[in-house]
Amino acid sequence: MREIIDGKLVARGLLDRLRVSVDRLKAEHGIVPHLVVVIVGDDPASKLYVGNKQRKAEELGLQSRTIALEHDTSQEELLRIIDELNRDAAVHGILVQLPLPRHIDKELVINAISPEKDVDGFHNANAGKLATGQLDCMIPCTPQGCIHLIKTVKQDLAGSNAVVVGRSNIVGKPVALLLLYENCTVTVLHSASRNLEEHCLRADIIVAAVGKARFIRASWIKPGAIVVDVGINLVEESGKKRFVGDVEFEGLQDVPCSVTPVPGGVGPMTIAFLLVNTVLGSCKQCGVSYEDIKSSLLQ
């Protein structure tokens, strides 16, 4: 029978441990990790995501602030705000909520954030460090969450065949690298790949991040596989709208595999690791040893 990997439950445990670390930082060092989220425009989904992030941060005792800017805010003004936040020693994490309006250069904005405050892990400096195995950098939140969920099922991933479906800079590429550093044999599938079913059927681990509803068929997944579904797609069925993943979740009912649901799988882990990055970033910026905190969080 299918086993559900409950991302909400796993994230709750991670955040409980993180709360202990935050309390220690306050008591022993007088440090209150401080996250600032910048949102441009009034996209409803972005507002919802930002609200969730701020609420979770405050629940953990972090200082959290949102800077909400009008849709027509100039790129120059946004860059000026980021520069101020970079120079503010009391701010440990900066996140610019995506997507941005079309008149703003996303890459320019992301790379204007100080790498040590880039809690999304999207800055070119952090991407370069990750690509070369320097894992003391800010690592993107969703890929970290994927690995953590996989390890709730199987701790030692060495020698596992892993398939990543999707090659985005946000999920596909970084999660493939993290799996490689776990000594997996990694195959990345994309729009030009052939024989997708054949590759997936050989996989011990599948990470689906392609952004297409139910793209990965249940018949492509072998018994015993671990499946992490990063996709979140809004579909309309029988006159009702709901979110589904990139994996044919319903078809796995009788397949003996481990799979994350959508929603309630990867999403909570992404927010959890955003807060982890903020806390670890505060330690680094304040010269506080963080290895014991990191090991306690990722147990």
Curated annotation (Swiss-Prot):
Keywords of this entry: Amino-acid biosynthesis, Histidine biosynthesis, Hydrolase, Methionine biosynthesis, Multifunctional enzyme, NADP, One-carbon metabolism, Oxidoreductase, Purine biosynthesis
Residues noted as binding NADP(+) in the record, renumbered to the chain: G166, R167, S168, S191, I232
Matches recorded under Gene3D superfamilies: Leucine Dehydrogenase, chain A, domain 1, NAD(P)-binding Rossmann-like Domain
EC code(s) of this entry: 1.5.1.5, 3.5.4.9
GO biological process: L-histidine biosynthetic process; methionine biosynthetic process; purine nucleotide biosynthetic process; tetrahydrofolate interconversion
Disulfide bridge partners, by residue number: none
Catalytic activity, reaction form: (6R)-5,10-methylene-5,6,7,8-tetrahydrofolate + NADP(+) = (6R)-5,10-methenyltetrahydrofolate + NADPH; (6R)-5,10-methenyltetrahydrofolate + H2O = (6R)-10-formyltetrahydrofolate + H(+)
Annotated family: Belongs to the tetrahydrofolate dehydrogenase/cyclohydrolase family.
Classification via PANTHER family: C-1-TETRAHYDROFOLATE SYNTHASE, CYTOPLASMIC (PTHR48099:SF5), C-1-TETRAHYDROFOLATE SYNTHASE, CYTOPLASMIC-RELATED (PTHR48099)
Protein name, per record: Bifunctional protein FolD
Organism: Anaplasma marginale (strain St. Maries)
